[in-house]
Curated annotation (Swiss-Prot):
Modified residues (Phosphoserine): 4, 102
Subcellular location: Nucleus; Cytoplasm
Region feature (Disordered): 303-343, 372-420
Alphabetized Pfam families for the sequence: RRM_1, STL11_N
Residues bearing PTM N6-acetyllysine: 212
Quaternary structure, from the entry: Component of the pre-catalytic and catalytic spliceosome complexes. Component of the postcatalytic spliceosome P complex. Interacts with PDCD6; the interaction induces translocation of PDCD6 in the cytoplasm. Interacts with PPIL1.
Domain RRM: 232-305
Stated family: Belongs to the SLT11 family.
GO cellular component terms, A-Z: cytoplasm; nucleus; Prp19 complex; U2-type catalytic step 1 spliceosome; U2-type catalytic step 2 spliceosome
MF (Gene Ontology): pre-mRNA binding; U6 snRNA binding; zinc ion binding
Covalent link (Glycyl lysine isopeptide (Lys-Gly) (interchain with G-Cter in SUMO2)) residue numbers: 139, 149, 290
Functional summary from the UniProt entry: Required for pre-mRNA splicing as component of the activated spliceosome. Involved in the first step of pre-mRNA splicing. Binds directly to the internal stem-loop (ISL) domain of the U6 snRNA and to the pre-mRNA intron near the 5' splice site during the activation and catalytic phases of the spliceosome cycle. Involved in both translocations of the nuclear SLU7 to the cytoplasm and the cytosolic calcium-binding protein PDCD6 to the nucleus upon cellular stress responses.
Protein name, as recorded: Pre-mRNA-splicing factor RBM22
Length: 420
């Protein structure tokens, strides 16, 4: 191999020889059986410019081949993947991680200072067990709530897709389905995410992906406690099939005494009731948007009383099973409430457009026998009685839905009406 003509020394003792790369789960791909090629001193590290061992592999079917971009020394200094340069623990850019940990690692950028700094860090790495990062990152022991909220716990394999075919964009690709590149519309060149630099990603400056995540963190929603002080129940959603009641109890017992834990396997959720309101508030604050159990991110919300949920369902047109129904199209609006006795003459009960004077005049007739006598004189004709408030068992006027839209009602009472 032809050595570099840069300012670095040509001493082979500074070159790196490794047996296996340092990669994240996303870059490795979803296939557990992959073939990796190894090339000693195949390229220069894009950070320290030293020759290192390059690994190349295909992460999956119809994915592009990937290779290591930086040496293992630079990877261990920042605790990042050798290919995507994202943090191995949180899956976030270095700029976001450093902002969450509230520290700034000023690494030298000149050639001579970088070489001296790298040699000192290699000596420190050789004296450690290799399981923890070195330098400033190794001294940061505290975790951040922002990092737990933004952490990527599951791999994102779409990042390994091929690049966009430039010939297809120009309308000249003749490979069709056999083309190894994507036939999709490219992103807007004015989009800041379209211009990314690997050195900016490593040093944590001017990273557009990090800027986007930091803006998202500043606008994250908050979980405010309900006004009803009697509510001490938390809703935990997204349990899946692997999380049990014991796993939830092991996490939430630290916040206070737990009264009951109800797991609903059908809805993959659970309701955790605490003995005191203070314990429930602490659990909600410590677990909202950052609860991860068995590698699965869970959704934590405050529980609601049955009366409040019933009112919201009637207002939103939601069934007991949680299905939102669409209102029946083509129906007129709700009728106005009955007017007072003095407003009956000008009331419009059927939402009809205004018209001229009526052609027919109502003539008061004597009541038939058996009917109550007319009101005494001076009170006017007794045509309509003012209506009071509806009984409590009647629903307020609102959107009307077809009964067939509710799957819980279809055939629910068929067995009751059938003859034995």
């Amino acid at each position: 191999m032809a050595t570099s003509l840069g300012s670095n020394t040509y001493n082979r003792q500074n070159w790196e020889d490794a047996d296996f790369p340092i990669l994240c789960q996303t870059c490795l791909g979803e296939n557990p059986y992959i073939r990796v090629t190894k090339e000693k001193y195949g390229k220069e590290c894009k950070i320290c410019a030293r020759p290192f061992t390059v690994f190349r592999w295909c992460p999956g079917v119809r994915m592009r081949f990937k290779k290591t971009e930086v040496c293992q020394t630079c990877s261990k200094l920042k605790n990042v993947c050798q290919t995507c340069l994202l943090d191995l623990e949180y899956g976030l850019p270095i700029q976001v991680r450093d902002a969450g940990l509230s520290f700034k690692d000023d690494m030298p950028k000149s050639d001579v200072n970088k070489e001296y700094y790298t040699q000192n860090m290699e000596r420190e790495i050789s004296n450690s067990d290799g399981t923890r990062p070195v330098g400033m990152l190794g001294k940061a022991t505290s975790t951040s709530d922002m990092l737990l909220k933004l952490a990527r716990t599951t791999p994102y394999y779409k990042r390994n897709r091929p690049h966009i075919c430039s010939f297809w964009v120009k309308g000249e690709c003749k490979r069709g389905e056999e083309c190894p590149y994507r036939h999709e519309k490219p992103t807007d060149p004015d989009d800041p995410l379209a211009d990314q630099n690997i050195k900016d990603r490593y040093y944590g400056i001017n990273d557009p992906v990090a800027d986007k995540l930091l803006k998202r963190a500043s606008t994250m929603p908050r979980l405010d406690p309900p006004e009803d002080k009697t509510i001490t129940t938390l809703y935990v959603g997204g349990l899946g099939d692997t999380i049990t009641e014991t796993d939830l109890r092991n996490h939430f017992y630290q916040f206070g005494e737990i009264r009951t834990i109800t797991v609903v396997q059908r809805q993959q959720c659970a309701f955790i009731q605490f003995a005191t309101r203070q314990a429930a508030e602490v659990a909600a604050e410590k677990s909202f948007n950052k609860l991860i159990v068995n590698g699965r991110r869970l959704n934590v919300k405050w529980g609601r009383s049955q009366a409040a949920r019933g009112k919201e369902k009637e207002k939103d047109g939601t069934t007991d099973s949680g299905i939102k129904l669409e209102p029946v199209p083509g129906l007129p609006g709700a009728l106005p409430p009955p007017p007072a006795a003095e407003e009956e003459a000008s009331a419009n009960y059927f939402n009809l457009p205004p018209s001229g004077p009526p052609a027919v005049v109502n003539i008061a007739l004597p009541p038939p026998p058996g009917i109550a006598p007319p009101p005494p004189p001076g009170f006017g004709p007794h045509m309509f009685h003012p209506m009071g408030p509806p009984p409590p068992f009647m629903r307020a006027p609102g959107p009307i839905h077809y009964p067939s839209q509710d799957p819980q009602r279809m055939g629910a009472h068929a067995g009751k009406h059938s003859s034995p």
